[in-house]
Structure formats: C-alpha cells, structure tokens
Amino acid sequence: MTRNILLITTDQMRYDALGCNGGKVANTRNIDRLSTEGINYRRAHNQNVVCMPARATIMTGQHVRSHGVRMNGMSMPEERHTIAHHLKEHGYNTALLGKAHFEPWLGSPEDFFENRMASENSTGPHRGFDHMELANHFFEGHSHYDKYMDAYPEQKRAFYPMVTNKGQNTASKGATGATQVWPMDIPRDIYHTDWVSQRTKSWLGTQSSDKPWFCWMSFPDPHHPWDIPASELHRINWKDVPLPRLYSENRSLLESWLNEKPAHWRGYFDGSLWTNLESPREFIPADMTADQVREINAMTHIENELIDEAVGDVIGFLHSKQWMKNTDIFFTTDHGELQGDFGLLFKGPYHVDALMHLPFIWKPAETANISPAEVASPVGHVDLASTFCAIAGISPPDYCEGKPLPTSEDEAVQQQREIVLTEWDSEHGPIDMHLKSIYHRDGFLCTAYEKSHLYDGTEGELYDMKEDPDQLRNLWSDPGYAVHRTELTDRLYASLPDETTEKLPRKAPV
C-alpha cells in the first residue's frame, strides 16, 4: 500500500518546548503521543538557524551552500526542482498549508509569485505543490490568511504592527512591557494556528484513498510577535513560569557567560555591536527584566499549546478517514529561539542548542511495522527529502545530499551517522558574519568563525557537551583541546559540499 506523508512544521520552536523533550510548561500531549508511538530523534540539527535557508534545505535535501539560500531575503529560482516536484512526478498529490517563506515576504509581488497568489485568487501550482494556501505571523499584505482576515477588519487591526518606518517594531501591550507581547481581542477560531489546521483538513478532505498525498502543514507560531488571542491567557500565568536555566537576574553572571564567546555575543547583549539583523534594531537584550523573560516564555508556550491542539485535530481527522495505517507523520521546526538563554532573545548568528537543536519526530505509518525508538545519533533537515522518497518507494533526486533517517540507534550506527553540519552566512552591506559548525556524536560541538568585518578567521567556539551541555565553557583556545579543535575543523570542511557557483541575490530584508 502506498503511504501518505504529512509533514508538520512550526516556526521558531525550541527542542525543549515539548513534554516529550523535557518541557515542563506547555501541555503538548498530541505531539508527545507521536513521539511515544514513533521515533524521537534526540540530536537533530538544522542546517541554518533562520527561516528561509532552513526551509530551502527541507525542500531540496541540500546543505545551504548547495541550494544557495544563505540568508533570509534570498529565494531559490522558481524553476528549481524540489522534493514536492519529485513526489508529484511519482504520483503524489501535493499541498502546503500555512507558512511557506520560500520567497521574501517583503519582496515585490511582481517578483515573487507567493506574494501575489492570494490577490490573483490562485492556490498554485507552485514549486511542486498542486495546492498552496499561505499564512504568516504578521500581515504583509498578500497571504491567503491576510485576505481571509479582510472579512474581519476589526480583528485584523488587532494584530501586532510588525513593521514600522524604523524596521521591526518593539512595542508591547503585555503586563511587563516585554517587546512584541501583544494579547489581542480575536476569536481563537480565526487565529492563524486554527486557520492552518482547518485549511489542512479541508484539502485532505478532497483526497481519495486511491492516490497518495504529500501534505505540508506549516504553522507560523510560536515565532514572534507574541500576539495571542487574549482569551487564551488563562492557560499559563506568566508569573508562574520559571526562568530559563540559562538566564540569570545577575547581570555580571550573564556577562561572564557571554565573555566566554566571541565578541558579537556580548555586543548583541549590551547593544555595543550591531550584528544581529534578525532582531529589532532598537532592542537591547540587557534591558530585559526577569519578568519580561517570564512573560515572553508564557506567551510562547501558550502558542505551543494551541499548535498541539491543532495537530491533535488534524490527527483526529486522519483517524476518521482511517488513514493512520498508511500515513507517515513528521513533526519538526525550522529553528529555535533564544527565549532568554544567555540573556538574549530572538535568533541570529549564534550556534547554540537554543537555535540548532530541533524537535524532530517521525511517526511511521502502521503498515510500515516500525517499532517506536529513540535515536541519539545526529540527523538533520537535510535527511527529510531522502526519507520521503524511501517512504514513497522511489529513488531520491540526484541533488539530495541527505540519506533516509534511521529507524533505530542500531541502524544509525550502521549508517555511520557521526556528524551534522550547520552554516551561517549573512551579508548586509559592510556587516557580514560567517560561521560553520560541526556536531559530533561524541558530544563535541565546534564552530569555526570565518573572516568577516568583525573577525579575522582565527576565532571560534568548542564545547564538550557531555560535560558542558549548556555551552558555558568555550574550549576553542584551550591548549588541552587543540587536537580536538583541529580534527573537528578539518572534518567540518572536508564534509561540507562544494559551494555552488550561483550567488543568489538578496531581494528583501525577510
């Protein structure tokens, strides 16, 4: 029996957001059940820690230097072949409901089809998907959800005003003044989380059992802004939320942690260096209070609970159609969120667990007869496309650089899964940052800093995460670890694929 594939993604969710991964705040029972009944990959990393490059890797099974989407604001050529094309060519119906972000949101509609689909009353086909209905976590003027909300003008005006003439907004309506916390008077059932699950069920309802489907259900949350329906504030009292383990109200302690790392970490914290273009220009993390960190975490976990319930709703629909027996379900995110770790917020050129370490779960179809398992060996987004092909019983496209995910730790060892790679390359005028990371199964994480406006190419980070899971002691310059550093950097550059000769232009900020 041919198997269906449901890929569920969130945007900016930490590994420890889920109960099955040690989370203690949000109730994520539906996603936790996928873990219990399926395979939980305990060391999955993205290949880039921001949206567009990470999503391009999911779409192609390629590392960043191969697909060329090095940072937000870049887009693969529209004609570039993707895993959605490949599955479609082999008999699958294909759809994406929710956040795509394969093209810049702030790019011109004339240049990018995603930015004019809704205004043209189109749902595709596009980039291999027969059907697309798009949503974002703010109103940029051209998503299907944006158009849907035109029927609710008062509620639409209640959403966070994300972009101002100064760039990304920092305004707040929260109890603590925390940036981008914005409870709003909007019914939950028209909020984008439930909209995505409802549109997913609607498309699935058009499918028959005689043809397989590949459906990507992509939630815009828990990405900032944290503008949740105010009716849901009762779920988690921000005053009861514990501070993150890697946050301290002692500024001197935070600074001592940051001083272990290269200069742009401390520079972001105190506002002395502007290298993180993924956060509002006017936001200075050092100004955050402990209560603001608590409130942001509470809003994030409320969004996580809403996502979990939406996931449960769609899984219930699959049960009603008797599709669980031949449907494989994947759950992951594009990247994480600092969420107060090291006194920081948002994301950027920081290769730490908060941003790289992903929730990553595969619930195989019942007909696959695959036992539940936990896999400790490293895997990544780069492996998803090849796994989808293995499920479909087809060979992956030649451009795929990953391999099918192991279904047990024994299989991971047989596959010789020892490393996973993550890249960062951003260029904004004179400000550029270039980081390359390798995580090894023995627990070492090594990040090489290449030459940039700030670094001369000799800097880096090295952590023994078995002894130092919080990445507080940087061993890069420790003579006792010089051999480890050399071996890992050599392995890193030997393992990275050749860089594509195609230099994609950056067309918009995001």
Model-derived segments and their meaning:
Residues L496-T500:
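Short arginine-rich
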Residues M1-Y449, Y455-T458, Q471-D490, L504, ...:
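Formylglycine-dependent sulfatase
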Residues D468:
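Intrinsically disordered, low-complexity polar regions and short flexible loop motifs
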